Amino acid sequence: MKIMQELEAFINEFNSSNDEAFSIDSIRIEFSKQHKLEELKKLGNWNKVEKNSSLLSKLKKRLQKREITSAWRLEKENIYYYNMQDAPQYRKATLVIFGMKQYHKPSPSKDLISKILQIMKDVSSVDICIDLPYKPNIEALATRYILTPYRNSNGAVSDTKYINDTFVPMLDKIVFYNKAFKNGLQGTLWRIEATISIPNFRALALPLHEFKQITDQARR
């Protein structure tokens, strides 16, 4: 089975068995440029993101634990790869496919995503999300988790909250944010999104039950 099909089958089976509606929004793959970059370049033009651009600043906020020196974007797609700061790691990069679950603009095509995954033959982490037509009860989680608010460049606190320690292996973090406000959508729409590590895709296991326990509590 192909990687994307296997991921979707895993999540769809969980959704069917648990009356849930989880979706994939982002995929990340760490890779060796020596072995993969030439194949990626055959997919289209990769354009360097300007160092002082607001886009690069925004992208840096999305990458955990490591600094990045540069980023390259696949044409007009919401698909990038990052170069790492440390010299030994510069041979490696992280490719990210963003915006697979969107309402305000087209998502990357499934055909393109499949071609990328055929080249990479792996997935390092995914963002799994659920969208709600109301604001979740985030504070209900405060008795068990530390809720960290997001601060903008001016230091102002926003409605966005993070759980950076879920106490669950592979469930790296969870973010709650106003999706309608972020994307200029009409009405009320909030997103709960989990970043989940995948140590070994050949033995695919995602902590979806644990994520559901958290989303259920926020939906009460």
Named regions from a protein language model:
Residues M1-R220:
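Structured, helix-rich domain cores that form ligand/interaction pockets
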